Structures are given as structure tokens and as C-alpha cells.
Amino acid sequence: MPDAVGRELPRDGTVLAFDYGEKKIGVALGNFITREARALTILPNITVEGRFEAVAALIQEWNPVQLIVGMPVNPEGGEQPSMKLARRFGNQLNGRFGLPVEWVDERYTSRAASMAGARRGELDAEAARIILQQYFDQFPL
């Protein structure tokens, strides 16, 4: 099953998705077989070293074949300042862990997470879940 630019996507395996924020990073987990995402955790984003130590622990635990990063796009579809940070985070994930990274438009995911009933302390992980579910839904089997 090819992605938007014709690359072959994995057909099985675990996927981790990230909702990158300057203070917190929401994380979700899913797999290509069930194509269902679930909120996993929220990582503090205080230092670069701490951020990637926490991500490394998740990668070691879940052994993903693909990483997804939410791309913050403004309502009109244009770039906003946090987009550059999310793109850099995704590129660093690829460089540090050698795993393929895909970006998903994360417009309104925090609002959707709130409307879905996620509590305040769980919003970032729920937003990551929505990002990952959008990714799965974008490429039906």
C-alpha cells in the first residue's frame, strides 16, 4: 500500500505517533493489523536529552516500524511557527532512531480531543491518538 508520494508503507507492526508541543509531547500507539490507535502517555518536553531518552525508552518497549508526527497547520492550511519545531522533531526522530517518519495534519486535534471528553491532563495523548487514527484512516487496506 503506497503513501501519498508512492512509498510502500509497512503492512504490519507497531506505530508510535507524537503530538509535539514545546512543553509536552503526547504519544499514541497503534498497529497496522488492527488499524486502531490508543492514547499512550505524555512526555515532558523540558530538555532535548530528556525528551529523546523518553522516546528511546518507548521505542525500545514497543519496537515500532513507523513513527508519525502531527504537523500543526493553521485553519487556512498555511504554516504556523510551531510547524518548524514539529518538523525538526520528526527529522531528529528519523536521524536518531533510523525509523521512517510521516507527518499528518493535526488541525483541530486538541479541540477534538477535548470534545471527545479527554481530561485536561490527557489532552496531548488523546490528540496523538487522533493524529494516528487519521493516518490509519487515510490509507485503507
Swiss-Prot record:
Its EC number is 3.1.-.-. Keywords: Cytoplasm, Hydrolase, Nuclease, Ribosome biogenesis. GO terms for cellular component: cytosol. Its main location: cytoplasm. One of its GO terms (biological process) is rRNA 5'-end processing. GO terms for molecular function: nuclease activity. It is an enzyme of class 3 (hydrolase). The keyword Glycoprotein does not apply. It is found in: Cytoplasm. Could be a nuclease involved in processing of the 5'-end of pre-16S rRNA. Belongs to the YqgF nuclease family. This is Putative pre-16S rRNA nuclease. It comes from Cupriavidus necator (strain ATCC 17699 / DSM 428 / KCTC 22496 / NCIMB 10442 / H16 / Stanier 337).
